[in-house]
């Protein structure tokens, strides 16, 4: 039976905004300068008078100014064209664009609902509660707000009025808001859909700030026969071409590097070479660095070798693990005729994967059987690959646009409670944004445009889970943490699918829903089973997931999770769903910083004190502000709190430092003004040696101290050693000024609380 359809749009009541009060007026603002420097003090970016809410950190300000402001074509007060200067412009152009497109195609019940939608989105962005993926910041609203067009770049879209595939006529009238793409590649060299065509399709994606993943398993292995005679040069030779092409492109022009995922099935003839590709290249890098080449990731050593511009993953079916458990062999098969080309002990394959991942963090593993068991649309084909960060897994030639909710904005630190209603409201609000973004988007190929329209996948997620748990005083690796995380994730995904079904009630389900209806409803019911931890209720699942354990989960969160999934299934059974997928949990790298998140995505904190190097140069020192709040909640006094934080972060000053301090520096010949410069630079330094240089102090200072320019101009010059300080003295001063980067061993910290501050790195 076909799904029901009604005639009505979405209604939005106010949650965070106020009637007759502009959302822009709900915040106080600062005008700040944004300067990004290399560790040696050299400026790589500078912009003055950047307007942001006072609550935004300098890091969020710098990300906005350097990465997300439109840098040209924006009308200025004097009538000229220039760049964006305030977050108000960015929030307006994005929220207004979503409102305009949604209103144009009947997404809202009334004009008032559309206005509330717009104002709540502006508030959400300015409050850092939820923001979209980077391509939205780069592209969305440039045409509506500023009239920016640009020549067509070979993109396509499906016109919702007549459902016909059309070629875009400009670069920005329909933006490219999608961050995640999965493209197919056929075993063909030069024709459409083949190997060389893939690099062109990838280039269109990279240019507008997005990333792409592809499964290359169709391409025949080395020495397989070619139709015209001779033998194939093999997959690896072509992967190196794609790697070079990606490395030559900065996605978004000046925003970030190309993002690329390469997937390969575990039975491909060249799988062992693929597994060890980066291992061998890292050996070459080590040799080049030993010979004196730059060891930075953008240095000449890494630029010389291959394999540095993609994440690599192997697709592993359950049948491999059966062979592994039985100490059997694993067969590698020809792409052309399926014959067995090689049989290798499964243990050897697994050991090589583990060794390679240990050596260079690649390849990742994607569990093909499980992924396809949770596939909502198997009638459309198998899931073969993922996007570069591996959160989006769906059909080839589809795209996904993301948004991430900042969980800390819904966490009440006074009683460790979570604002379920506010979180559900925000989920519904932004699921609507992501659906509208599909409506307005253009895509890099005909296939991607058509299938993205047909399936309408979205990627709502969250960030700052690790920080929220840390502030709560709950260890990340604990049953209680898993209960809370499972419930919050279930609420988000359930409400997102409920919203999708709500939109389907008046817009209709996605075009390919009916043929996948039973499969999708089976997957939805399996999600509901996980919310109830009903192990016997799963259908079509070989390896059952861990459900939400009631004994470890706060009751109010568990009730909200099960209700969300009851509603999602009930409405879906009646109306279908507007979107084939709704949620993913992305790493939220750059958008996490603009929301001032201490932790990204679902991950634990990477480190308590972090230094993020930006593409193109520059560093940020990031200190996890969850630590002092967590210590306070755990009952530590302010003095104990300060001592623990200073142990990890450092005092950011030479006042009182051992050996190298204001007094000893005066004795060495530094002036008070020069010492003040050093103390100022110490606030963002991650090693004191980096600030004792000509960029911080000036050539006149170094000359006065007795050093010739040819000496201090040498990059290997160490001023502290030249002044007579010993290595032990420098280390002691460095720990005091810049911190130890860990709380382990900190004064007053109790052993039973160490696990709360555990990190992905061994430095918590």
Segments predicted by a language model, with ranges:
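Extended catalytic cores of very large enzyme megasubunits
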Residues: 1-764
């Amino acid at each position: 039976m076909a799904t029901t359809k009604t005639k009505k749009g979405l209604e939005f009541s106010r949650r965070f905004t106020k009637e007759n009060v502009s959302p822009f007026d709900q915040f106080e603002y600062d005008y700040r300068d944004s300067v990004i420097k290399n560790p040696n003090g050299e400026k790589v970016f500078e912009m003055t008078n950047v307007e942001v809410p006072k609550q935004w950190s300098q890091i969020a300000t710098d990300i906005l100014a350097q990465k997300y402001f439109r840098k040209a074509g924006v009308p200025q007060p004097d009538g000229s064209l220039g760049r964006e200067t305030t977050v108000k412009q960015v929030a307006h152009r994005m929220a207004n664009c979503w409102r305009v497109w949604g209103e144009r195609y009947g997404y809202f019940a009334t004009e008032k609902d559309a206005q509330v939608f717009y104002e709540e989105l502006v508030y959400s962005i300015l409050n850092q509660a939820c923001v979209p993926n980077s391509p939205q910041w780069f592209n969305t609203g440039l045409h509506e707000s500023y009239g920016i067009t640009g020549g067509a770049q070979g993109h396509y879209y499906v016109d919702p009025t007549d459902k016909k595939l059309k070629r875009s006529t400009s670069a920005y009238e329909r933006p490219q808001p999608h961050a995640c793409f999965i493209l197919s590649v056929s075993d063909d060299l030069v024709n459409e859909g083949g190997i060389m065509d893939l690099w062109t399709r990838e280039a269109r994606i990279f240019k507008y700030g997005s990333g792409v993943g592809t499964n290359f398993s169709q391409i025949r292995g080395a020495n397989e026969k070619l139709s015209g005679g001779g033998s194939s040069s093999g997959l690896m030779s072509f992967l190196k071409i794609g790697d070079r092409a990606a490395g030559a492109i900065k996605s978004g022009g000046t925003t970030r590097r190309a993002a690329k995922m390469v997937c390969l099935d575990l039975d491909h003839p060249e799988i062992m070479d693929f597994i060890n590709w980066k291992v061998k290249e890292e050996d070459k890098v080590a040799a080049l660095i030993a010979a004196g080449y730059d060891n930075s990731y953008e240095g000449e050593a890494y630029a010389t070798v291959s394999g540095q511009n993609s994440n690599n993953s192997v697709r592993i079916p359950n049948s491999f693990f059966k062979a592994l458990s039985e100490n059997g062999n694993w067969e590698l098969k020809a792409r052309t005729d399926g014959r067995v080309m090689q049989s290798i002990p499964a243990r050897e394959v697994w050991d090589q994967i583990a060794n390679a991942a240990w050596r260079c963090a690649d390849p990742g593993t994607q569990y093909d059987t499980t992924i396809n068991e949770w596939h909502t649309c198997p009638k459309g084909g198998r899931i073969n690959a993922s996007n570069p960060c591996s959160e989006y897994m769906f059909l080839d030639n589809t795209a996904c646009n993301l948004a991430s909710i900042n969980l800390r904005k819904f966490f009440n630190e006074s009683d460790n409670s979570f604002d379920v209603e506010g979180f559900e409201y925000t989920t519904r609000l932004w699921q609507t944004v992501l659906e509208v973004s599909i409506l307005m988007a253009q895509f890099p190929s005909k296939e991607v445009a058509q299938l993205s329209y047909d399936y309408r996948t979205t990627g709502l997620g969250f960030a700052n889970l690790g920080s929220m748990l840390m502030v709560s005083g709950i260890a990340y690796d604990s049953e209680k943490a898993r209960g809370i995380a499972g419930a919050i994730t279930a609420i988000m995904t359930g409400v997102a699918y409920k919203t999708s079904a709500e939109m389907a009630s008046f817009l209709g389900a996605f075009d390919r829903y009916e043929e996948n209806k039973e499969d999708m409803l089976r997957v939805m019911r399996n999600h509901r089973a996980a919310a109830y931890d009903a192990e016997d209720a799963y259908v079509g699942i070989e390896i059952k997931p861990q459900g939400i354990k009631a004994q470890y989960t706060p009751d109010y969160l568990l009730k909200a999770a099960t209700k969300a999934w009851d509603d999602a299934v009930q409405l879906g059974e009646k109306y279908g769903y507007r979107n084939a997928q709704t949620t993913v949990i992305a790493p939220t790298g750059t958008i996490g910083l603009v929301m001032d998140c201490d932790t990204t995505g679902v991950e634990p904190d990477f480190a308590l004190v972090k230094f993020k190097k930006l593409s193109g140069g520059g560093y940020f020192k990031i200190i996890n502000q969850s630590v002092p709040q967590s210590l306070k909640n755990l009952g530590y006094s302010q003095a104990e709190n300060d001592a623990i934080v200073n142990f990890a972060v450092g005092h950011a000053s030479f006042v009182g430092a051992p050996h190298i301090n204001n007094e000893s520096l005066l004795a060495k010949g530094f002036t008070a003004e020069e010492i003040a410069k050093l103390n100022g630079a110490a606030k963002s330094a991650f090693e004191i040696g980096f600030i004792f240089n000509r960029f911080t102090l000036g050539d006149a200072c170094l000359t006065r101290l007795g050093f010739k320019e040819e000496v201090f101009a040498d990059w290997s010059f160490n001023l502290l050693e030249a002044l007579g300080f010993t290595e032990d003295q420098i280390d002691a001063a460095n720990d005091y000024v810049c911190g130890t980067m860990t709380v382990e061993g900190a004064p007053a910290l109790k052993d039973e609380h160490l696990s709360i501050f555990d990190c992905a790195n061994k430095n918590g």
